[in-house]
């Protein structure tokens, strides 16, 4: 089946002209949904055909078969059962596929009325894409599921790019301006499952590196979706308002991104409209800038191998609700830069630490909170069931209990606002759902039985009739068994025959022994080992049961719709209450964590201070405790301004391999992040002057797919740091200059230290094995030497994992090599070579360089030139218009420029 018709050839005129009626319908629907696998409903299965079938069978690991021929080719086919469709959708979505779900929208009996060859009407009811999921099975309860739109407007004084992101499962809708420089960092911060972009922009070479990194997450869409001229009207129509003035002020490029996101939601949800919150604008300056390399190196929400276990988020997470877990992850990805907002969060955590019984009471109550935002979204999109209504009911009940627990004290601002939002939840809705819904709820509304007995007296009567009839059937079975003497006689039911009497083939003669018996027991079906009969009274009873059951279900479904309508009308209050519960969950979980792990409250302000006493690595410390491997060795770090200066310090860290340099670097970056999300930190004391940008170049990696070696990746990331770090930034660099010749590496590291000190003027930690760099501390006033301490004992090296002042004179690489198991002969030869190299170095010590080289003068001079603005020659060149000059005028101008350069 290798020769398969492609979608392009499938939708040709020749293809349609030769197709059967059913296949013609399929081709038409497929043509309207390019780029998506088409789940085509046929009875109890979703079928896929042609190249969709080949692709899906490979991705799902299901059998590929065929269904006839088309245009002389076999038609590949595979299918999945409707009842298990969510499981298969999940696999496809995880692999980055998009699926168009095509349902039968009329009863087959209606189609037959139009003629024997008529095809059942079908249409796509939904496009399932990674960024527009709502089903519980397809979503992680602890992770947001964002759809993002990227827009760009050229020739505008406004920011060139904007991002809008929506989680239709919770109603979150946010937008922000960005720049090309920070575009990828902002995308990674939000971590969308799907990013839509205008097709013209998708093929822009300037953005090719961004889309290469994103892979299948980025999806081109028609440029018309991003038209800023109609953006405001599109958003206003979605929210059913005449003006967006009540939402705030947005730039043109922000509106273009927001409108594209809304248009894509409408496109994928067909006729349904999820209850989105009003768009909220985020300022780039309000969050800590963390570039993609730093996020990966620090393993904030997942490890370098892609696992959640072992990440900072995994070490922090003590939340007990899905909403709380999502909010904690969101905060960790976007630390704040406003000390006032940070301290408001810290106040809430401190309040709950001080009142242990309150914290424990809240956490116990929060364990019963259901995921109201996601249940609300499914109900609004008509994908919800009775259990979603039950989730709203349970959430409202729990919220009321939590409000009672929290009420009564003088609460900090964050908890006080949460309490107000909980009190604003609709009590009448809670009472209505409590009185209507049964305790045990079915998954699907079509199963019925979700209304409480007593909620509707008329329904109770119909149910009694239905249930009584079923008891009558049990009585009939006993009666017929006695009449015939067949003890094994059973009354059964299926969707084809309805209720019927079944006896074994050996007992069938008794049922037809006399004319009277034949008249009473009417033969219906002969099976291999059994025969089936019915009676007039059984048929009458079946009719009554069917009517009663149908009537009961109709009444329940009508009540279901009324309850859904009541819930959706309170969508804003429910979402606000759910957010309040998430805020309380995060605050109480961080309080619990701080008590459990002995964290301290950091001082966070607008100063340039960076002082940590007894700091610890939050992830490594917990790992050591789990392994009973002894305590984590705490260390101090002080990068505060030196001698009353206004710029922070840089530590040059030397020491042995395995001494703990990388751990020390990372732990200080993580402590800064924890402080700025509003968490207590693993230290005895900490004072963090807000960091605006965090850069980390730790660990080695390559990018072979893009033709970049480990050294090239290191240089690219270092270049980004040196070009973007400000005086308020925190920079941690580990072993810059590896992977090239020794002198090349030393030179690069040397120049990088100078640049960080004199141009960036940032706070930083610079770990290196180039001990020659330690002499820089004699000339660079804010540079201090620090080292990882070790002890030597009888030829062995003992790593103390302690940081102290001073410089290491050795890296102990040979000792580490011996510990790793290198052959003894290799280790001994390495010692001999090292001795010779050290003797040579003593004859030309690096300390001479400090006097021979004009340290950092080039960097300073270039910085001064850049700040001074354009020269007279540059100004003159700007004023020239060559098209309007005669040859003589051009020559005179050239002489004038030469004269000006001579003066310079």
Curated annotation (Swiss-Prot):
Q: Which GO terms describe its cellular component?
A: cytosol
What the protein does comes down to:
This protein is involved in the repair of mismatches in DNA. It is possible that it carries out the mismatch recognition step. This protein has a weak ATPase activity.
**GO molecular function (one):** ATP-dependent DNA damage sensor activity
An example of a Pfam family matching this protein is MutS_I
Write down the Gene3D superfamilies for this protein, in alphabetical order.
Answer: 1.10.1420.10, 6.10.140.430, DNA repair protein MutS, domain I, MutS, connector domain, P-loop containing nucleotide triphosphate hydrolases
User: Which HAMAP family does this chain map to?
Assistant: MutS (MF_00096)
What the record says about family reads: Belongs to the DNA mismatch repair MutS family.
Residues reported in the UniProt entry to bind ATP: 655-662
Name of the protein this chain belongs to: DNA mismatch repair protein MutS
Give the matching SUPFAM superfamilies.
Answer: DNA repair protein MutS, domain I, DNA repair protein MutS, domain II, DNA repair protein MutS, domain III, P-loop containing nucleoside triphosphate hydrolases
Q: What keywords tag this UniProt record?
A: ATP-binding, DNA damage, DNA repair, DNA-binding, Nucleotide-binding
* InterPro entries the record matches: DNA_mismatch_repair_MutS, DNA_mismatch_repair_MutS-lik_N, DNA_mismatch_repair_MutS/MSH, DNA_mismatch_repair_MutS_C, DNA_mismatch_repair_MutS_clamp, DNA_mismatch_repair_MutS_core, DNA_mismatch_repair_MutS_N, DNA_mismatch_repair_MutS_sf
Which SMART domains does this chain map to?
MUTSac, MUTSd
GO BP term, pick one: mismatch repair
């Amino acid at each position: 089946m290798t020769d398969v018709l492609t979608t392009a050839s499938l939708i040709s005129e020749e293809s349609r002209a030769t197709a059967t009626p059913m296949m013609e319908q399929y081709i038409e629907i497929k043509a309207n949904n390019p780029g998506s696998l088409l789940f085509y409903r046929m009875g109890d299965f979703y079928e896929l055909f042609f190249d969709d079938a080949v692709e899906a069978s490979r991705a799902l690991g299901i059998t590929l078969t065929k269904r006839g021929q088309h245009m002389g080719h076999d038609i590949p086919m595979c299918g999945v059962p409707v009842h298990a469709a969510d499981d298969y959708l999940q696999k496809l979505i995880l692999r980055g596929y998009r699926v168009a779900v095509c349902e039968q929208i009329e009863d087959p009996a209606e189609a037959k009325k139009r003629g024997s060859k008529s095809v059942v009407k079908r249409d796509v009811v939904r496009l399932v894409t990674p960024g527009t999921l709502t089903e519980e099975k397809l979503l992680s309860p602890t992770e947001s599921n964002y759809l993002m739109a990227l827009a760009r407007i050229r020739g505008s004084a406004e920011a060139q790019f904007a991002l809008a992101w929506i989680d239709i499962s919770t109603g979150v809708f946010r937008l922000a301006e960005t720049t090309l420089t920070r575009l990828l960092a902002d995308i990674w911060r939000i971590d969308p499952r799907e990013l839509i972009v205008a097709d013209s922009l998708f093929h822009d070479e300037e953005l090719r590196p961004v889309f290469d990194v994103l892979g299948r997450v980025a999806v081109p869409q028609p440029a018309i979706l991003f038209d800023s001229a109609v953006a405001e009207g599109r958003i206003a129509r979605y929210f059913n308002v005449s003006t967006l003035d009540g939402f705030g002020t947005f730039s043109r490029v922000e509106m273009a991104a927001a409108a594209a996101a809304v248009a894509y939601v409408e496109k994928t949800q067909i006729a349904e409209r999820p209850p989105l919150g009003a768009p909220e604008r985020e300022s780039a300056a309000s969050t800590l800038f963390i570039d993609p390399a730093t996020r990966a190196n620090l393993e904030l929400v997942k490890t370098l191998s892609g696992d959640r276990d072992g990440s900072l988020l995994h070490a922090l997470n003590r939340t007990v609700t899905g909403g709380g877990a999502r909010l904690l992850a969101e905060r960790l990805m976007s630390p704040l830069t406003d000390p006032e907002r940070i301290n408001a969060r810290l106040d809430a955590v401190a309040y709950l630490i001080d009142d242990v019984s309150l914290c424990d009471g809240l956490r116990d109550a929060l364990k019963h909170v259901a995921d109201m935002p996601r249940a609300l979204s499914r109900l609004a999109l008509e994908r919800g069931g009775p259990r979603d209504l039950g989730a709203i009911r349970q959430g409202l009940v729990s919220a009321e209990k939590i409000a009672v627990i929290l009420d009564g004290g003088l609460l900090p601002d964050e908890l006080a606002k949460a309490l107000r939002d909980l009190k604003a939840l609709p009590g009448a809705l809670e009472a209505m759902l409590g009185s209507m819904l049964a305790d045990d709820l079915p998954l699907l509304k079509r199963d019925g039985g979700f209304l409480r007995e007593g909620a509707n007296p008329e329904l109770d009567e119909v149910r009694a009739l239905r249930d009584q009839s079923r008891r009558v059937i049990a009585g009939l079975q006993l009666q017929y068994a006695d009449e015939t003497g067949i003890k094994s006689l059973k009354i059964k039911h299926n969707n084809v025959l309805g209720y019927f009497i079944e006896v074994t083939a050996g007992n069938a003669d008794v049922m037809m022994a006399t004319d009277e018996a034949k008249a009473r027991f009417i033969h219906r079906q002969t099976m291999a080992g059994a025969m089936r009969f019915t009676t007039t009274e059984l048929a009458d009873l079946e009719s009554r049961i069917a009517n009663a059951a149908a009537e009961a279900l109709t009444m329940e479904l009508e009540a279901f719709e009324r309850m859904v309508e009541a819930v959706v009308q309170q969508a804003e209050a429910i979402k606000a209450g759910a957010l309040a519960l998430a805020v309380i969950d995060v605050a109480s979980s961080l309080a619990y964590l701080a008590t459990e792990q002995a964290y301290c409250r950091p001082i966070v302000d607008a100063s340039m201070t960076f002082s940590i006493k007894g700091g610890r690595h939050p992830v490594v410390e917990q790992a050591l405790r789990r392994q009973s491997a002894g305590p984590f060795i705490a260390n101090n770090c002080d990068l505060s301004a030196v001698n009353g200066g206004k710029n922070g310090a840089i530590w040059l860290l030397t020491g042995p391999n395995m001494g703990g340099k990388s751990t020390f670097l990372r732990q200080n970056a993580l402590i800064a992040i924890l402080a700025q999300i509003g968490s207590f930190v693993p230290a005895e004391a900490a004072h963090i002057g807000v960091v605006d940008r965090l850069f980390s170049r730790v660990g080695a990696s390559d990018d072979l797919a893009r033709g970049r070696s480990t050294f090239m990746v290191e240089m690219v990331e270092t270049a980004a740091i040196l070009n973007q770090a400000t005086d308020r930034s925190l920079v941690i660099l580990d072993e810059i200059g590896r992977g090239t010749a020794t002198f090349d590496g030393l030179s690069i590291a040397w120049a990088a230290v100078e640049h960080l000190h004199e141009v960036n003027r940032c706070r930083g930690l610079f770990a290196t094995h180039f001990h020659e760099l330690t002499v820089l501390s004699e000339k660079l006033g804010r540079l201090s030497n620090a080292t990882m301490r070790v002890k030597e004992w009888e030829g062995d090296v003992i790593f103390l994992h302690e940081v102290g002042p001073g410089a290491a004179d050795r890296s102990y690489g040979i000792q580490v090599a011996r510990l790793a198991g290198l052959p003894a002969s290799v280790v001994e030869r390495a010692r001999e070579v090292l001795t010779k190299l050290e003797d040579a170095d003593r004859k030309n010590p690096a300390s001479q360089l400090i006097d021979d080289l004009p340290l950092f003068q080039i960097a300073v001079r270039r910085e001064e030139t850049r700040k001074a603005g354009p020269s007279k020659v540059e100004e003159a060149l700007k004023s020239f218009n060559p098209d309007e000059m005669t040859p003589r005028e051009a020559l005179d101008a050239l002489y004038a420029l030469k004269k000006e350069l001579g003066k310079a």
